Amino acid sequence: MLPATLPLDAYRPFRRDVEAQRPAMEAIAARHGLPPGELAPFSQGTQIVWGTQRSVIKLFVPTWPEDTRIEMLMLERLVGAGLPVPQLEARGEVAGWPYVVMSRLPGQRVPEAWPELDADARERLAHDIGAAMAHLAALPVTGLDALLAPQESLLGERRPRLLQDQRERGGDDALEAQLQAFLDALPPLLPAESVLVHADLTADNILVHDGRLAGFIDFADAFVGPWTYELAATSCFVTQGDRRSQRALLSGRGVETTPELLVTLRCWAVLHRYSHVATMMQRAGHASLWSWLDTLWLP
């Protein structure tokens, strides 16, 4: 039904092969009483995700067991937490591949919803996102020591990897020179308490319904780290320099806009584990790293 495991070069075509995935998904649906006629694949995501009208099945390739462990840990941790997140319905294995069944949240991803929103609606949505971030950050982190990455540890991980990561993600010599200058001039970051962070709140992981936040999805990258880190992905992929939305995001998060905070947020926008600087600069129409960062977080 499924291969025992798949290296990355074999997984990519398998991820696109809907018919190869179908027998496993139908078996899971039958096991948990989901209507097989409603099963349909999702195109987004690293893992294999299918859904019915009310539920979502997420099938984890055994190649990355850490993703599975974190996602399941977070789904269990967030049950009853009062956050707009999928609720865990079942978990198991099929042919050695772990999976979860969870509730399906309503709404569209941000790239589909944002262009249809006026300035007031965007401001409300950004405030909703910030408030949900604050709610997540307020949850206890007891028992999550394995996910701990305090600010200095995270910086120690990210700084040496920046140039190589961005080269692999489409950066050229000109960008590498700018990134090296960025590293050479990296200022002290605002001290930040370690809290529970989703860590990948890009536009694809935020759902919108009727102009308001419907929920956060995909917690496989979550960890316990500096609260400032959480704002980086959302600033790059959602508010994208829109001043009203930016202010609303910070207001919803319950933090004051200070020069020190803005400097820190610019730094995390570059140093984020999943930052694609060349792509983001190109989309924003900037050849200069510094001008792009200035538009992300205006004073």
Question: Can you say where each PLM-predicted feature lies in the sequence?
Answer:
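Phosphate/pyrophosphate-binding loops and the adjoining catalytic core of nucleotide-dependent enzymes
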Residues: 1-15, 19
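An alpha-helical support segment within catalytic cores of ATP-dependent transferases
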Residues: 15-31, 106, 122, 126-127, ...
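Helix-rich C-terminal or lid/interface subdomains of diverse kinases
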Residues: 18, 44-47, 221, 226, ...
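Short, surface-exposed acidic
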Residues: 35-39, 172-176, 255-265
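ATP-binding pocket architecture of kinase catalytic cores
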Residues: 38-150, 191
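Active-site acidic catalytic loop and adjacent metal/ATP-binding pocket
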Residues: 45-53, 57, 181-231
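Short beta-strand segments
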Residues: 58-60, 89, 196-199, 217, ...
